[in-house]
Regions:
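Acceptor/aglycone-binding surface of glycosyltransferases and processive sugar-polymer synthases
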Residues: 51-74, 79, 91-170, 174, ...
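Short, well-formed alpha-helical segments that are part of the catalytic scaffolds
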Residues: 7-25
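Hydrophobic helical membrane-anchoring modules
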Residues: 168-293
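Acidic helix N-cap motif at the loop->helix transition within catalytic regions
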Residues: 14-18, 39-48
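Conserved sequence signature across two-component system core domains
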Residues: 9, 33-35, 55
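A conserved acidic beta->alpha catalytic loop
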Residues: 34-42, 87
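Cell-envelope/extracellular polymer assembly enzymes that use nucleotide-activated donors
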Residues: 2-4
């Protein structure tokens, strides 16, 4: 079986050599996607013998993952393992991550940071954010997971051939997860240990979390338009009808129009109708596209 390891990298000249050196001991093919780095990441990776994909500008984590998928497909790899380039993942965890695919027990394996108790050093804000985003992802997939944001994953050949990520940002992890679930592929998790020593993430956790959340909601709205738009639409319609009845009753009793109540009633009815129409139109479009495909 041809196992390829892919590493998305952005300005990781300090870590990339050691990571590649350790990976070449367990894999014949290591791909590094240099995502518009301004340092010597690409040169060092080439010198260490990795296949290097170079982005002229920084596309984002999702853009790098997409390039790794396409390159692994081009190389006719049987499996793609992805891990981060910041040195936080243990190379020794690669074998446990690929094992379920080797045993035909899964098509996607996620290295989860929450299946082991040795994660006390994970920043609390990160732990809370990851769990919230994971809960959101779990609301739209069949096999629930504990760590939807882990970059340490293994993808089987079926996934490589049938799924191409489209997100450029960090939302790609949930995008892939939802697409994998929708196609009926099997998802498994194994415990991994991550070191947060010297964690130098420059991303604002709030903007990062908001970006991933919005991306996830976008895919949920496309996959489940009736639930996402239709149910809130019905709720707003019901609220609008209640306020409309209150307006009519008030006018009957006092011969005066309760302006505030009337505005709320009309506004919520209009908004609810728009949501319902959106759900029906989007549902029809999505089904039409699926039938053509």
């Amino acid at each position: 079986m041809k196992i390829t390891v892919g590493v998305p990298a952005y300005n990781e000249e300090k870590n990339i050599a050691g990571i590649i050196q350790n990976l070449t001991e367990i894999s014949d093919t290591v791909i590094v996607c240099d995502d518009g780095s301004t340092d010597n990441t690409a040169k060092i990776a080439e010198k260490m013998g990795a296949i290097v994909i170079t982005h002229e500008r920084n596309l984002g984590y999702g853009g790098a993952i997409r390039s790794l998928f396409l390159k692994a497909r081009e190389l006719e790899s049987d499996m793609l393992v992805t891990l981060d380039s910041d040195g936080q993942h243990r190379i020794s965890d690669v074998l446990p991550v690929v094992e379920p695919i080797l045993k035909n027990q899964a098509d996607l394996v996620i290295g989860s940071r929450f299946l082991t108790e040795n994660q006390e050093d994970m920043p609390k804000y990160r732990k809370i954010g990851i769990k919230m985003i994971t809960s959101l992802a779990n609301s739209s997939i069949e096999d629930t997971v504990s760590d939807s944001q882990s970059g340490f994953r293994a993808y089987g050949k079926n996934i490589l051939s049938e799924i191409t990520p489209s997100e450029n940002g960090m939302g790609v992890s949930n995008e892939i997860l939802m697409k994998v679930s929708k196609k009926g592929f099997k998802i498994a998790e194994v415990p991994i240990i991550v070191s947060y020593e010297g964690d130098t993430s420059t991303q604002n956790p709030i903007s990062h979390g908001a970006s991933v959340t919005l991306s996830t909601l976008k895919f949920i709205s496309i996959d489940h338009p009736l639930k996402f738009y239709g149910l809130p639409g019905l709720v707003f319609l019901a609220i609008g009808l209640v306020f409309t009845v209150m307006t009519i009753q008030g006018f009957t009793e006092t011969r005066q129009i309760l302006l505030g109540t009337a505005v709320i009633g009309v506004g919520t009815i209009i908004f609810g109708t728009v949501l319902l129409m959106t759900s029906i139109i989007l549902y029809s479009i999505v089904n039409l596209i699926r039938e053509k495909n």
